[in-house]
Amino acid sequence: MKTTHLKLIKSFILIATVFLTSITIAQDGTIYPLEAPDEPNAIPLNTGGVENQPASETWFKQWGDPMARNITNATLTPFLPDPEKANGTAVIVTPGGGFMWLSMGNEGWEVAEALAEKGIAAFVLKYRLHPTAESLDDFTTFMNRPRTAPSKTSDNTTPPSPPQRDLSNQLEDAEAAYAMIVDRADDWGVDIDRIGMIGFSAGAGLTMHSTLNSKTMKMAFIGPIYGGMGPVDVPKDAPPMFNVIATDDFLFRGQNGVIESWHNAGIPVEFHLYQNGGHGFGLGNPGRTSNRWFDSFMYWLEVNKFLEANTVKNSK
């Protein structure tokens, strides 16, 4: 289990490194300052701060998407469905950003709104991050520094291991989010036996890390979206998994170890490997085959009876 934990951490530091590389290439990748948006529905999780973090939370905009960094106080923001549509299922949504920033729009709020439209109570987890430079100029310099992207090869050779990082803060935040949903399940119309978790990029890593290591989270299903694909040690009580990645994502590299791990453990798994989409596509980008993943996810939930209307009667 410890080996799996370290592999996950290494994979998502690689995400940050390679994802940042694309900034110097993308014409619309300029980093702009952004005033912190109002988050009137964000609920503090009170999980503590971040050691050696002198900078306060700040925001920036890139590719038209609001991003948050230097997060020291985790929050959970509910996106509740119309009561006429509500089916009792809940999903914790974890945005990505290499554990150094969070893509709050593309991989957070927009996804939560789409889930709520389908009758699902969605909860965006703004989890604590590793420290970055205090000033936006210094942060931009760091992100734009020269680096070599991994070569595009068809083999599944394991890339060099990046430095290891601790995800204990992030796991604590995820556990606190889950506990809050359970505690307020009746108020929010949530069936505590139908709480799932999906994440994007590093958020997929946190979703997987929570599944493999949490002693308190009992997810009904998980959905890692363009996350690490290496093999893992699957717990006996692991939930069904819906997994998405594109062949032109630098994380793919021909690997499907996590899929094999789930299959070999005898736990239901669905895998969608798309022709194109790259990395960080959120709900989708124009002209990419990966654009239909959300529809497939909804159908998967439907077939597995998570979208059936449910009269919530929780026994905590």
Language model: regions and residue ranges:
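N-terminal cap/lid segment of alpha/beta-hydrolase-fold proteins
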Residues: D28-K85
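Short beta-strand element of the alpha/beta-hydrolase
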Residues: N87-G96
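Short amphipathic alpha-helix adjacent to the substrate-entry channel of hydrolases
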Residues: G105-V124, E260
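Alpha/beta-hydrolase active-site loop
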Residues: D138-D186, W293-S296
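Primarily recognizes the serine-hydrolase "nucleophile elbow" in alpha/beta-hydrolase
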Residues: R165-A238
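Short beta-strand/loop motif that positions the catalytic acidic residue
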Residues: F242-I245
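Acidic catalytic loop of the alpha/beta-hydrolase fold
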Residues: T247-R253
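C-terminal catalytic histidine-bearing segment of alpha/beta-hydrolase fold enzymes
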Residues: P268-K316
